[in-house]
Amino acid sequence: MAFTDYETEQLHKALLKETRRCAVTLGMKKTSVDQLTKAVGIAKGSFYKFYESKEMAFFAVLESIHSELYGVADHALSEANGLPSSERAAEAVLAVCRRLSDTGDMVFIENDAKLAFAETAGGCQKHPLPR
């Protein structure tokens, strides 16, 4: 059964949300595609309509976190307009740190981000990681 555009959008959001939850609670290695699909109520084969692999789903989580943190920093900089540059920068860094703490995303970044990045197609070749 094919999904409507609306269903596709909602399932994609649900998969990303569940992958993020698992990233923080279980980690990438301990999370299976079966767990993700069961949580959102789709067949395992349907997962691959959204992501090429489990690793790509976790990479999408990294991209989502990056976008959110950029927005948090940008908002903090705007709110601190008029302060000296060093204070504005400090406000942005603190806002990002608070968000990482509040969401638990730092657990995923510390434990699995490098692995998620390295295991995505071409990740190592396009953007070599420091050793």
Question: Regions from the language model: what does each represent?
Answer:
Residues M1-L26, V33-A39:
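Basic, helix-initiating cap at the start of DNA-binding domains
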Residues M1-T4, Y51, S78-E79, A118-E119:
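A short, mixed-charge helix-start or loop-turn motif at secondary-structure junctions
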Residues A2, G27-M28, Y70, D74-G82, ...:
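Short, flexible helix-adjacent loops and helix caps
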Residues E7, L11, V61, N81, ...:
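Conserved acidic
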Residues E9-K17, K29-K30, F50-D74, L94:
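An amphipathic alpha-helix adjacent to DNA-recognition modules
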Residues C22-M56, A60:
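Helix-turn-helix
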Residues A60, D74-T103:
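Hydrophobic alpha-helical connector segments
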Residues R98-R131:
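Short secondary-structure transition hinges
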